[in-house]
Amino acid sequence: MADFNKVGVLILRGDRLLLCRKNRDTSKLILPGGRTEAGETDLDCLARELREELGEVTLRNVEYVGTYEDRAAFDDPTIVKTLRVALYRGNLVGTPTPASEITEVVWFGPDSDVAELTPIFINRILPDLLSRGILPWSARRAPGPRWGER
């Protein structure tokens, strides 16, 4: 059973993936999204979290991608927790700008450094998205250093 359950969203612009950096817990890049509140559906959660994290944006054409589980990312190596992410993908309407606890918005691509990513993204999400052709990167062009060897 996971210690944390979150909902995340995959937003692409060309071959770039929208990721965020928070101001607490980890310096790694994360998917936009968060924890559902009582009575919220996953899609309600995504709408709320996107407004809180990225300002006046909305999500269109949302579809479920999959659920992934791995260790959560913390800068403190003594903290060991498990994270489960229900991942969706959709089209963003509006310009994302850092808000609330988000300090940076990054368009991550095949030329970006995989060391910036969280364990769940490296170990579970990225390999699945590449194998299913959801990310428009070939394994040859996947983020370095060689993501498959991590």
List PLM regions with ranges:
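NUDIX/MutT-family hydrolases
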Residues: 87-89, 97-130
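Active-site-adjacent beta-strand/loop module that shapes the phosphate/pyrophosphate-binding cleft
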Residues: 69-96, 128
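A short coil-to-beta-strand element that immediately follows conserved catalytic motifs
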Residues: 57-67
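Conserved hydrophobic "DFG−1" position in protein kinase catalytic cores
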Residues: 11-12, 19, 90, 107
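Conserved Nudix-box catalytic region and its N-terminal flanking loop in Nudix hydrolases
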Residues: 16-56
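Conserved N-terminal beta-strand and adjoining loop/helix that marks the start
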Residues: 1-17, 35
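Charged phosphate-binding loop/patch that engages nucleotide di/tri-phosphates or the phosphate backbone
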Residues: 117-150
